[in-house]
């Protein structure tokens, strides 16, 4: 099938942090349109594809994206007009070649990705198909287990917690709807516990709380308390996941990590994590070491990878070259997937496919700067990834993804699968 792209345009809109981002629209020959907004991260891996910002301090404190918008309207549009909207790989290849750099720094990953996503949406809309079905075909049916970021630390908060995200994982349920309900009830229970202990319960960028607690371990204890008080069983119905974002507390010059006010070597930090895993129902740990500390990842996965999902985010940046190195070294048993780390839909799908073929799980993820766009909800089902990270149980830009997944589960009906603990196929649980 050949359906011509007749118009491509972009504009500057705002993300959930009030910072500018790129929205693209792609129009097909019959007038069908696809629209997409790109997200933006706060803690970014150094190997990520680059978003372009204007750096004009007089506009949006230098964070404007008029240059990226111009790149869509003046460079990308002429190249894509006349192309087949149903040939996503060729569209994305054209975008990559048009940019010509390894990290998409000429046109900007924000410009390229907005268009790539909008093309996929336009094609789905033309066929009258939901996006997940267009991208994933008839076998797209697995609803993801949500990893819900309810306590924030690190670069996502102005508090004294080193680890960036403390998540609840409602994996012991039979449907996404039930898992979401459990997550919401635990979130509200957690708010009450924190409030009664005198903590501020304002929420951060991803909708989680950012209390000043005595240690990272105390944050885990508070989560366990919230799970139990909400009427659920930790370690059976609801588990804990951590995103350490260890690059943010790593001193490159000294080669040490700073955790709970102490210097720790990779080996000592490994022991610290192992103690936490032994004491608490922790099922997933993301970026436990800095993005270049390959040896530590390999050793840690060797030690605990049979019972804990070890996830590479900054380590891989959704890049198949870095992922193939990780597969070869057995550095992790899971990868975090972020569309804007790599910059096109096709490359994102390639990374998921490579991971799954090598018995690694893939977690489809949001960024801290999000929007009302629900592309990643459909992507999670399209790829049967089994996992999604899309924030806490507050803030509309996070809830939008959860609500889209509720719709998809309802639409799939009896075909829908929520695999719960079985989604953790790379560990022996």
UniProtKB/Swiss-Prot annotation:
One of its GO terms (molecular function) is magnesium ion binding. It catalyses: (2R)-2-phosphoglycerate = phosphoenolpyruvate + H2O. Its main location: cytoplasm. Mg(2+) binds at residues 243, 286, 313. Inhibited by fluoride and phosphate. It holds the Pfam family Enolase_N. Its EC number is 4.2.1.11. Optimum temperature is 90 degrees Celsius. It is found in: Cytoplasm; Secreted; Cell surface. Pathway: Carbohydrate degradation; glycolysis; pyruvate from D-glyceraldehyde 3-phosphate: step 4/5. It is an enzyme of class 4 (lyase). Optimum pH is 7.5. SMART domains: Enolase_C, Enolase_N. The active site is at 206 (proton donor), 338 (proton acceptor). (2R)-2-phosphoglycerate binds at residues 164, 338, 367-368, 389. Binds a second Mg(2+) ion via substrate during catalysis. GO terms for cellular component: cell surface; extracellular region; phosphopyruvate hydratase complex. Its cofactor is Mg(2+). Coiled coil: none annotated. PANTHER family: ENOLASE. Catalyzes the reversible conversion of 2-phosphoglycerate (2-PG) into phosphoenolpyruvate (PEP). It is essential for the degradation of carbohydrates via glycolysis. NCBIfam families: eno. Homooctamer. Forms a ring-shaped particle. Belongs to the enolase family. This is Enolase. It comes from Thermotoga maritima (strain ATCC 43589 / DSM 3109 / JCM 10099 / NBRC 100826 / MSB8).
